[in-house]
Amino acid sequence: MKFKARVYIRLRASVSDAAGNAVKANVNKVAADIKVDKLRINKIIELTFECESQEKAREQLDILSDRMFANIVIEDWEYDLEVIND
């Protein structure tokens, strides 16, 4: 079976987002008419892959997300998974 996944990785709410704070501090230099209350920078990883079943695909995505894609000490993750046909 062939799959497409999007893994969303976000800093935990308790973790300060230095990059987001830097962007927020400078938004008005580019877009003077908006006032940003909160800005967080996140990551999205998109991948297509083959796996024997949807259950196995989810198991493997869990492992990848925990061990490779996210720093689980400071980040949370979730994903969308869909079966695709070529």
Residue map of PLM features:
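Long, contiguous binding/interaction regions
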Residues: 2-46, 50-86
